[in-house]
């Protein structure tokens, strides 16, 4: 179907609708997902992405809702790193640390965009100049979203640079599979990972990988998110896996997130105005990876561009 494009003071909104009537809405401000409307087990279509009903509020958003994060998703400890023997200092926007790319990351930028010939996808493009938020190199990032007839949203991320740099983008959508009816504490979650990254009280990795065995972090088998959830802020933890599954018994909706990236961060919105109203599953390179030689490094250069995918598969099943 032909994408529907509406223009607002805040940005351009692109709706991709499939043959069943399910649809996603994307916006060029932050290349973000602002709505994803899919059926429940009874066939009722509802929005499962938690955002703002007034799109103008995204301009004031402090929680990265639905946006592409960059240049570096998650935290860089001390807002500094060494790359190829040179030390770089990036913007510290969370105490002494850099979080989600600094004060004016990709989430706060208007991206150019074009729709594909099939009518089921949109490509967003942004260019980040050398020195942006302290990061080296000029980077051009393209985010390709495609919405399928079987309710799969695929995101391909492609990044190029003119000199060695770091690039670690992700999408920061907040999901509530019940359509916003209640919290996500009764959602069931399964994460295919044996380990998670141990962090300090600023969520900076210590360098140690911890086993999930006999901990609140263990989601290798289906478990309700609220069953062992740490209080008061819930989960904000990166797993060493690339697949997660969510099931909402109330609606029967399911979500499967798969990526080509080495980690996936579980965040239960504990620092949002309404804690635990939603959850984020953010595929990414591990936080603070340039400061830990044993971690996979998100280094790119002119001969080695960035190329990764994330898929969000929505479905239904009976409890």
Give each language-model segment a name.
Residues 1-319:
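An exposed, glycine/acidic-rich loop-and-rim segment of catalytic or binding clefts
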């Amino acid at each position: 179907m032909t994408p529907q494009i509406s223009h607002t003071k805040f940005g351009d909104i692109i709706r991709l609708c499939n043959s069943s009537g399910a649809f996603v809405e994307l916006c060029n401000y932050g290349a973000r997902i602002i709505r994803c409307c899919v059926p429940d087990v009874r066939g009722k279509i509802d929005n499962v992405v938690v955002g703002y009903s007034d799109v103008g509020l995204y301009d004031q958003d402090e929680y990265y809702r639905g946006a592409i994060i960059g240049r570096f998703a998650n935290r860089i400890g001390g807002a500094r790193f060494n790359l190829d023997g040179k030390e770089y200092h990036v913007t510290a926007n969370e105490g002494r640390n850099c979080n989600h790319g600094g004060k004016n990351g990709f989430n706060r930028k208007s991206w150019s965009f074009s729709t594909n010939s099939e009518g089921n996808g949109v490509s967003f493009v942004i260019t980040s100049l050398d020195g942006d938020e302290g990061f080296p190199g000029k980077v051009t990032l393209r985010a390709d979203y495609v919405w399928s007839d079987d309710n799969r949203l695929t995101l391909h991320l492609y990044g190029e640079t003119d000199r060695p740099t770091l690039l670690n983008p992700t999408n920061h959508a907040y999901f509530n599979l019940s359509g916003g009816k209640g919290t996500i504490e009764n959602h069931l979650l399964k994460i295919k990972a044996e380990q998670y990254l141990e962090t300090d009280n600023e969520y900076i990795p210590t360098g140690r990988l911890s086993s999930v065995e006999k901990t609140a972090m263990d989601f290798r088998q289906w478990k309700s998110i609220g069953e062992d959830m740490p209080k008061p802020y819930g989960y904000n933890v990166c797993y060493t896996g690339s697949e997660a599954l969510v099931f909402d018994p109330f609606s029967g909706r399911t979500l499967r997130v798969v990526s080509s990236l080495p980690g996936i961060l579980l965040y239960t919105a504990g620092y949002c105005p309404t804690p635990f109203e939603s959850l984020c599953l953010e595929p990414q390179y591990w936080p603070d990876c340039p400061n830990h030689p044993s971690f996979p490094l998100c280094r790119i250069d002119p001969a080695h561009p960035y190329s990764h995918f994330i898929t969000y598969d929505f479905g239904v099943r009976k409890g």
